A protein has these predicted regions:
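A structure-centric signal for secondary-structure junctions around beta-strands
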Residues: 33, 57, 78-80, 141
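Residues embedded in well-ordered beta-strands
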Residues: 35-37, 83, 150
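Generic protein-terminus/edge-of-domain signal
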Residues: 1-60, 67
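All-alpha amphipathic helical-bundle segments outside canonical DNA-binding/catalytic cores
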Residues: 133-149
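A conserved hydrophobic position in a structured secondary element of the catalytic/binding core
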Residues: 63-64, 86
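Short acidic (Asp/Glu) patches
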Residues: 64-69, 107
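A hydrophobic/aromatic-rich effector-binding and dimerization subdomain
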Residues: 2-17, 72-134, 152-161
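DNA-binding recognition helix and immediately preceding turn/loop
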Residues: 165-167
Length: 167
């Protein structure tokens, strides 16, 4: 059994990674915010709730705050992904308490496979959020939060009514 560790992030944390070598997380971990993990290439193994999910291009995992998880490369030499972690506080800048409650009901833990068109659109949303974090100045924080909400709403759209592997 792997050890568990808390992995804190700011209200919004986004990272693109293209890794050309094996990488196994040394410990299980959790965050105090949501995580959205989008596979863009290669292969990665996500362990959550005693289930191993094989993630390849187009696979998206949604995890809630404090969901314990970890990932491994196993036999895969390469993987490419975007990961986004965010707190409800980041969304509360633009959403009402009732809107947050409704979103909490809709943003459920799952692993879904997106078709190529959905994958490309989701990638565009990730790039937009990432791009706004590289800018500063007048209204930059509002742009960051607006792009985040757009991405989250597309995640909800992609996971509603789809065949998901429930977590």
């Amino acid at each position: 059994m792997k050890r568990k560790a808390f992995s804190p992030h700011d209200d919004i944390y986004i990272q693109y990674l293209r890794n050309m070598e094996k990488h196994d997380m040394p410990v299980q971990h959790y965050h105090d915010g949501y995580e959205i993990f989008l596979m863009l290439g290669g292969k990665r193994y996500l362990f959550y709730d005693n289930i191993c999910f094989t993630l390849e291009r187009g696979d998206m995992a949604v995890l809630r705050p404090f969901d314990i998880h970890y990932a491994q490369s196993r036999d895969a030499e390469y993987y490419e992904r975007f990961v986004l972690n965010f707190s409800e506080t980041a969304l509360s800048a633009l959403l009402s308490r009732e809107e947050l409650r409704l979103l909490r009901e809709k943003l459920v833990p799952c692993v879904v496979h997106l078709n190529e068109e959905q994958t490309e659109l989701m990638l565009d949303f990730f790039k937009r959020v990432n791009g706004y974090f590289e800018k500063s100045g007048f209204l930059s924080e509002k742009l960051q939060h607006t792009a985040l909400i757009q991405l989250v709403m597309y995640v909800v759209e992609c996971t509603q009514g789809e065949q998901t592997v429930g977590l």
